[in-house]
């Protein structure tokens, strides 16, 4: 006890402090319990937080929700003096001594600015040696043999040219005749159906010959060997396919159903003419009606089918014209097979 001017200092009662702390803790526990009850029963207080049920003036309970927010930088960033516009402005000011000329009315908006020159497109060509590739401009590649990957990408970028309705040829939207020329040879692979001319390609990407398909030519294609025109030497198609990075030469389009049948009769290797081959049916895999059904199930065949038979009562189809269409799309069948296929489906046709 300290005495000062006859007065005694008030004594500090520790029990009172403990009671106040207990009351504060008890009130806090009650508020938490009430908050949990409201969160379970009512839907509206779910948006509230725990600190909204606490008294702000309660000094004994630490308000842990007050977290010091980091300093928010202003949205306006400093002007970059290294941008394209600032660099061009600086160059223009150095070139023109008078700065006032920059803002004069005599200058037009087009007289000042930054333009990026467009580079000419470069294409790779396959030369005599496979390793050496010459880069040429777009104007020069018409007289060159373009690399197959470049040729395919160019052909895919071209817009397809649809034929007239009376031609009934190449109705598949992916097929088109390119404007580049016959010297770019991998058209046999990028067309939706087999083209009416086979391009024979050498190991170095050169065009060896062109061959119109026939039944005998189709037999040679199925055997994997095709004969050069006016030459006894045989040309290995598998070797030509490996020249373009292809392990197996595709006799039909990738992604399309192959024109093969369930029959397992082997193709007889013979030297007969086309008439005897057709009469003796030595090629059952080619001269089969299921090839017609397979063709009309393909995307291009569906379009042709709907075009021909959208009004079958009013439209009478000539079987010779239909056979010519099938032959041009790579489906080789005899006329009798086509007649039987049409009769099974009750399609009106003219012989």
Swiss-Prot record:
GO cellular component: cytoplasm; cytosol; mitotic spindle; nucleus
GO biological-process terms attached to the record: DNA double-strand break processing; double-strand break repair; double-strand break repair via single-strand annealing; gene conversion at mating-type locus
Signal sequence, start to end: none
Transmembrane segments: none
GO molecular function, one term: endodeoxyribonuclease activator activity
Name listed for the protein in its UniProt record: Uncharacterized protein C1322.02
Organism: Schizosaccharomyces pombe (strain 972 / ATCC 24843)
């Amino acid at each position: 006890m300290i005495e000062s001017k006859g007065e005694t200092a008030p004594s500090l009662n520790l029990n009172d402090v403990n009671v106040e702390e207990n009351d504060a803790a008890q009130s806090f526990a009650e508020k938490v319990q009430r908050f949990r009850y409201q969160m379970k029963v009512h839907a509206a207080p779910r948006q509230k937080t725990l600190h909204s049920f606490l008294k702000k003036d309660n000094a004994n309970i630490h308000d842990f929700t007050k977290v010091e927010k980091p300093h928010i930088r202003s949205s306006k960033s400093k002007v970059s003096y290294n941008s394209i516009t600032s660099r061009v402005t600086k160059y223009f000011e150095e070139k023109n001594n008078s700065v006032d000329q920059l803002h004069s009315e005599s200058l037009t908006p087009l007289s000042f600015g930054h333009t990026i020159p467009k580079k000419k497109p470069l294409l790779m060509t396959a030369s005599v040696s496979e390793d050496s590739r010459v880069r040429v401009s777009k104007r020069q590649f018409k007289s060159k043999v373009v690399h197959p990957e470049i040729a395919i990408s160019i052909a895919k970028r071209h817009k397809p040219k649809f034929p007239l309705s009376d031609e009934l040829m190449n109705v598949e939207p992916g097929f088109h005749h390119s404007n580049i020329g016959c010297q770019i040879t991998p058209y046999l692979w990028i067309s939706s159906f087999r083209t009416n001319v086979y391009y024979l390609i050498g190991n170095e990407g050169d065009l060896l010959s062109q061959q119109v398909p026939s039944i005998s030519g189709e037999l040679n294609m199925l055997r994997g060997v095709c004969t050069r025109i006016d030459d006894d030497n045989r040309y290995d198609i598998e070797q030509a396919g490996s020249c373009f990075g292809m392990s197996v030469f595709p006799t039909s389009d990738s992604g399309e159903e192959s024109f093969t049948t369930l029959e397992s009769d082997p193709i007889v290797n013979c030297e007969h003419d086309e008439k005897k081959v057709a009469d003796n049916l030595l090629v059952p895999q080619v001269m089969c009606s299921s090839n017609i059904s397979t063709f009309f199930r393909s995307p291009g065949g569906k379009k042709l089918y709907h075009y021909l038979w959208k009004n079958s009562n009013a439209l009478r189809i000539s079987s010779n014209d239909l056979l010519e269409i099938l032959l041009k799309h790579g489906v080789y069948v005899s006329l009798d097979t086509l007649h039987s296929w049409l009769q099974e489906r009750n399609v009106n046709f003219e012989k």
